[in-house]
Swiss-Prot record:
Gene symbol of the encoding locus: LDLRAD3
SUPFAM superfamilies assigned: LDL receptor-like module
Membrane-protein topology: Single-pass type I membrane protein
Outcome of substituting residue 57 to G: Complete loss of interaction with Venezuelan equine encephalitis virus/VEEV spike proteins E1
Record field: transmembrane: 174-194
InterPro entries according to UniProt: LDL_receptor-like_sf, LDLR, LDLR_class-A_CS, LDrepeatLR_classA_rpt
Family affiliation: Belongs to the LDLR family.
Keywords: Cell membrane, Disulfide bond, Glycoprotein, Host-virus interaction, Lipoprotein, Membrane, Receptor, Repeat, Signal, Transmembrane, Transmembrane helix
Compartments reported by the entry: Cell membrane
A Pfam family recorded for this sequence: Ldl_recept_a
Expression sites by tissue: Expressed at high levels in brain, lung, skeletal muscle, and pancreas. Expressed at moderate levels in heart, placenta, and kidney but not detected in the liver.
Protein name from the UniProt record: Low-density lipoprotein receptor class A domain-containing protein 3
C-alpha cells in the first residue's frame, strides 16, 4: 500500500510532461478530444465544462453553455448548471459551488444581506455565528478584527462553522440527557434487585445455620421481667443474654446464702444448750420387763387363730346378735395371749 503513493506521483508527473507544451509531446493537444488551456496546458476534453476548474486560469469553464437547472425549490443551482447546493448556503462566506457562483452578487439581494447577518467590509454577508471563529469568512478578515483576546483561536472556545450544525446540537443534547436518565434508572433498578436478592438469601440460610448451631437450653435464662434485659443475637455465638445493672444488683441481693452461712445464721434454740446428764440406770433394763419372745411359727399360728376367731364371731352375730356363740368363749382365751404377744412385739 505504501508503494501506491510514489507510483501515483510518477504517473501524474509523466502525464503532465506529456501534456505540457514545450516537451516532446506538445503535438498531443492537436489530437481531437483534448483541450488546451489559455496558459498552454493540455487537459482531456471531458474535463471541459464539467463544473470544476481544471486549468490554472479556469479557462476550461469559461464560455460554457449553461444547462437548465434541475434543482428543487429549496436548493440553489450553481452557475455550471450541474451542481445544486442548499439554499441557505448561498452567500454564507464559503464557496459551496465548485465555480463559486453561490458567493456572487450577494449584496444585490436584500433578503440575503438582512440585519440577521453580518455585513463584511467588502460587501459580503455571512452568518453572525461565523464572527470571531478564527477563520477569514469575509475574505477581507473584517469578521476577525474586532474580536477579544479571549475569543482568539486556540482559547478552547467551541465555534460553529456552519448553520447546519446548529440544527443537530439540540437533538444531540436531548439524546445525551435521555441516555443519562435511562442509565441512572437502570443502575438504580439493578441495585434494588441485588439488595432484595441478598436479603432473601440471608433469610433462607438462617434456619440452616440454626440447625448447625443448636441453642442450648442451659444458656437460656427465663426472667419475670423481660423488659429489663437485653437479648442480642450473633450469627457465630447464638443468643446472648445481657442483664441490666439493676437486675444484677437485685439478683445479688436476693440470692440464697451458702450452706455454711445458713447453718451459722439459722441455728435452732436448743443448739447452744448443754447436753442432758448421763444416767447408767436407764441403760440396764430388767429381763422381766421385756415381752416374751415369739418365734416366727408362733406368730403365724396366732395370726391364723385370730382369723378363725373373726369368722366365728361373724357367724354368731348372724344367728343371735345378743347371745355369744358356743365357740367364742373357748377361742378367746387361746387367742388372747398370741394376739397380746404380737401387738407388743
Amino acid at each position: 500500500m505504501w508503494l501506491l503513493g510514489p507510483l501515483c506521483l510518477l504517473l501524474s508527473s509523466a502525464a503532465e510532461s506529456q501534456l505540457l507544451p514545450g516537451n516532446n509531446f506538445t503535438n498531443e493537444c492537436n489530437i481531437p478530444g483534448n483541450f488546451m488551456c489559455s496558459n498552454g496546458r493540455c487537459i482531456p476534453g471531458a474535463w471541459q465544462c464539467d463544473g470544476l476548474p481544471d486549468c490554472f486560469d479556469k479557462s476550461d469553464e469559461k464560455e460554457c453553455p449553461k444547462a437548465k437547472s434541475k434543482c428543487g425549490p429549496t436548493f440553489f443551482p450553481c452557475a455550471s448548471g450541474i451542481h445544486c447546493i442548499i439554499g441557505r448556503f448561498r452567500c454564507n462566506g464559503f464557496e459551496d459551488c465548485p465555480d463559486g457562483s453561490d458567493e456572487e452578487n450577494c449584496t444585490a439581494n436584500p433578503l440575503l444581506c438582512s440585519t440577521a447577518r453580518y455585513h463584511c467590509k467588502n460587501g459580503l454577508c455571512i452568518d453572525k455565528s461565523f464572527i470571531c471563529d478564527g477563520q477569514n469568512n469575509c475574505q477581507d478578515n473584517s469578521d476577525e478584527e474586532s474580536c477579544e483576546s479571549s475569543q482568539e483561536p486556540g482559547s478552547g472556545q467551541v465555534f460553529v462553522t456552519s448553520e447546519n450544525q446548529l440544527v443537530y446540537y439540540p437533538s444531540i443534547t436531548y439524546a445525551i440527557i435521555g441516555s443519562s436518565v435511562i442509565f441512572v434508572l437502570v443502575v438504580a433498578l439493578l441495585a434494588l434487585v441485588l439488595h432484595h436478592q441478598r436479603k432473601r438469601n440471608n433469610l433462607m440460610t438462617l434456619p440452616v445455620h440454626r440447625l448447625q448451631h443448636p441453642v442450648l437450653l442451659s444458656r437460656l435464662v427465663v426472667l419475670d421481667h423481660p423488659h429489663h434485659c437485653n437479648v442480642t443475637y450473633n450469627v457465630n455465638n447464638g443468643i446472648q443474654y445481657v442483664a441490666s445493672q439493676a437486675e444484677q444488683n437485685a439478683s445479688e441481693v436476693g440470692s440464697p446464702p451458702s450452706y455454711s452461712e445458713a447453718l451459722l445464721d439459722q441455728r435452732p434454740a436448743w443448739y447452744d444448750l448443754p447436753p442432758p446428764p448421763y444416767s447408767s440406770d436407764t441403760e440396764s433394763l430388767n429381763q422381766a420387763d421385756l415381752p416374751p419372745y415369739r418365734s416366727r411359727s408362733g406368730s403365724a399360728n396366732s395370726a391364723s387363730s385370730q382369723a378363725a376367731s373373726s369368722l366365728l364371731s361373724v357367724e354368731d352375730t348372724s344367728h343371735s346378735p345378743g347371745q355369744p356363740g358356743p365357740q367364742e368363749g373357748t377361742a378367746e382365751p387361746r387367742d388372747s395371749e398370741p394376739s397380746q404377744g404380737t401387738e407388743e412385739v
